[in-house]
From Swiss-Prot:
Designated name of the protein: DNA repair protein brc-2
Biased composition (Low complexity): 56-73
Region called Interaction with rad-51, residue ranges: 1-60
Entry comment, domain topic: The BRCA2 repeat-like region is required for rad-51 binding.
Ranges of Basic and acidic residues composition bias in the record: 1-12
Tissue: Expressed in the germline, with highest expression in cells undergoing oogenesis.
Naturally occurring in which organism (per UniProt): Caenorhabditis elegans
Length: 394
């Protein structure tokens, strides 16, 4: 028993040595501040806390060597009957010394830059705001009317104007109520919003806000109706397959002639209905001034890359079409009906303006194709289609 008691006492003496706690004997505890590198976090440990912890541990161990109770943790100290945990990492004061370590691995103090805020949404809002606040430009314009076309699907009119012979053409848009009284050959004075200008600063596109004055047939003499085949297009050209949209009542298409059936008859010079040569008055229009004249009726089959269709052509526009094909004058019109003449017009390209009436398309104007303007329009249309596709499928 004496030997065992001596061994226990020697072991307690060994534990009581301050240098032997938690370290092999002879290895001193580092008194330098301890740093934890986990997740790049630095913890500054004050030397005062380490000294206090060391004294507390030594006193607990010495008191325990003479105590009969159970072994208590050296990190728990009794103070006035209550247990208090004393950490060697305790920091006094309210200031925090915990900071993130720089990416370079150094421990020097630094201030992290503030988080960057997304500027994409704010920039979009600022652009929209600037567009809304962009001051609209209004201008009073005096111009001749070179063409008027109704856009049924949008219930508005598109009008080609020209201020003078030396100025560029102006494409004007207006509501149905404002444009219903405007006709080809009028001279109008309007207050309009400027939509587009040329590189030289000339107005090229407007929206008519008010019609201040409309002088009927007041345009300068010698003006010609603007062609449906030239820019700016009063009605934008379409393809045949697009005409399945029932909202479209009037449009322009570039087609090739396939077949043409031409009939001559004596008709009223006013309403074009058939009229006997001996009649003094047309029973349809009741116009005593109506005279019997040679009239034509034709039904033409045409095509483009997207399909085929039939178009009815009245006398006025049939004469214009025959002139384009090289058949001028009364005698040549009759010769056109010969079967061998068909080779002169089959697959000939033309630009036609058509309007829907009683579920059939009727030609209201015809012109020779301007390939430069039409090609430029097709390129612009294709580019616009690609931009829309990119927005839908970025």
């Amino acid at each position: 028993m004496g030997d065992s008691s001596k061994k226990v006492k020697d072991s307690f003496d060994t534990i009581s040595e301050p240098d032997s706690f938690d370290e092999p004997k002879g290895v001193p505890i580092s008194m330098e501040p301890v740093f934890s590198t986990a997740a790049g976090i630095r913890i500054d440990v004050k030397q005062e806390s380490i000294d206090k912890s060391k004294k507390m541990l030594n006193s607990d161990l010495k008191s325990k060597s003479s105590s009969k109770g159970g072994f208590s943790s050296p990190l728990v100290r009794k103070n006035n009957g209550s247990s208090a945990f004393v950490s060697p990492f305790r920091r006094e004061g309210t200031s925090s010394t915990t900071t993130k370590r720089p990416a370079s691995g150094g421990f020097e103090d630094f201030e992290a830059p503030p988080a960057k805020k997304s500027t994409s949404s704010s920039s979009k809002k600022s652009k929209k705001h600037s567009k809304k606040e962009k001051k609209k430009e209004f201008k009073e314009i005096h111009a001749d009317v070179l063409r008027v076309s109704r856009i049924y699907e949008k219930d508005k009119f598109r009008i080609i104007l020209q201020e003078s012979s030396s100025t560029p053409l102006i494409l004007a848009t207006c509501s149905y109520n404002r444009g219903s009284d405007i006709k080809f050959g009028d001279r109008i004075h309007v207050d309009a919003e400027v939509c587009k200008k040329s590189s030289s600063g000339d107005v090229t596109e407007i929206y008519i806000d008010r019609v201040l004055k409309n002088k009927e047939n007041g345009a300068k003499s010698g003006i010609r109706r603007h062609s449906i085949a030239k820019k700016p297009f009063c009605i934008k050209p379409r393809f045949i397959h697009e005409l399945s949209d029932t909202k479209i009542k009037k449009t322009v298409v570039q087609v090739n002639l396939l077949d043409l059936n031409l009939d001559f008859y004596a008709g009223c010079s006013k309403c074009k209905h058939s009229l006997p040569e001996a009649a003094n008055q047309c029973e349809f229009c009741k116009d005593s001034q109506g005279k019997s004249e040679l009239s034509m009726y034709s039904r033409v089959r045409v095509m483009d890359f997207s399909g085929q269709m039939f178009i009815n052509v009245t006398t006025k526009n049939m004469k214009k079409l025959l002139d384009l094909l090289g058949y001028e004058g009364f005698d040549n019109w009759f010769r056109f009906k010969d079967p061998q003449e068909r080779q002169n017009y089959v697959f000939r390209p033309v630009m036609v303006e058509i309007e829907k009436s009683n579920d059939e398309w009727e030609c209201t104007d015809v012109a020779e194709v301007d390939w430069k303007d039409f090609g430029s329009y097709l390129k612009h249309k294709e580019d616009k289609k690609k931009r829309r596709s990119k927005k839908k499928h970025p």
